[in-house]
Amino acid sequence: MTTPPLELATRLAATVESQHYTLYERGDECSIGLDAVMQVVIEPDGTVRRSDATLGPASSPCAGVAQALAGIPFEGWRAYGRADFELAHLLHGLGGSQGSRPLLTLSIPRAEIRLRPGQALLRALDSTDLDDLQARVVAQDAASEPAAGQPVQIGVDTHAGEEHLYKQHVAAALAEMHAHAYQKVILSRTVEAPADLDMVASYLAGRRCNTPARSFLLRDGDFQAYGFSPETVVEIDALGRVSTQPLAGTSALCGDSAENERLRRELLADPKEIAEHAVSVKLALQEMASICSPDSLGVSEFMEVSCRGSVQHLASRVSGRLASGRDAWSAFETLFPAVTASGIPKREALDSIRRHEPAPRGLYSGCVLLVDSDGAMDAALVLRAVYRHGERCWLQAGAGLVPSSTPEREWTETCEKLASVACHLRRRPLPDAAD
């Protein structure tokens, strides 16, 4: 393989006939799961189903998922999945979603491609699929730029939307915090994007100018999404080592290094941003303490500044080792949703979000994840993302509110976060009229 993994993966995503795939970038690996030979889902009412089997009772939806995965009849499987934000309502006793879409879906792919620099691992359940995969990978590795030309940049006004209404909701949430209803909440808003958006080209353009912890591109029938996750909800390896990566506290980045350094120093000294970060790390420690051996728990990074595209954040990492009797799904149930996309305490923040946002979030602030047969899990927080459902395309971003917040600053923060994605949107050039 001579093509970089990310570019090769996007070429493959753009050319496969499959209407169901997930591309997941982690470190130097891009992996793609194509179609599904088996699925495990959590329904809106909390029922766990596996497409090929009847499951017994379980103590919780996540325990039911662990039970379902334990019976998968394939060796060395990898599941590709996603969880909507509203799964959190179910896990925290607020009821699930009123819709019909599953709150969590895990798919064992019919075929899989794992790309690293200079190599490709191809896996399939059928030898014919394997031959087809090999031919596709070889062809796309040798391909040049499409004759249709470069995608065209398109604009989105990140200040669009009902500014007054958003600030009104922020003010209402601040009043609730001043009355000690909760300590922190993230309120988000959406911005519409052009319907002729090219999802794959936009993903590649955005990724080239971004430095995410993870990135993803997925399609499930008429639903598509891509994103540049600034942090992970949870990372667990096969040995039971677990970590979570709260990012909270945000400042803009620009093209001037001296100005960026000034903004960095300002971020590290801003009482509001520090307070927002500190309470997030505190909750992450409390949650991790409930699933980890006490002597293993620690903060391996604290208030580092991480650059993510056109914004920078305060970042910390809380790490430990799963206690006896705990597994990846115990950790997921405890840590989902990310504190940095919900609030503190989580249950009260979830209720606030449901009251102050006009519609369910869906995948926004949920996660896209990989789960391996050896017990490993990697779940990317879905932020800095673009969504398409049918003919509608949109972006969504939120701001973290603490008692010292102001509606004006939180509106500006959503604009900054939206801009980090909006400036890289692309569509294919229109056909030449002479043709």
Give the location of each predicted region:
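An N-terminal JmjN-like helical accessory module and its immediate linker preceding a catalytic domain
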Residues: 1-53
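Non-catalytic accessory segments adjacent to catalytic cores
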Residues: 57-193, 419-434
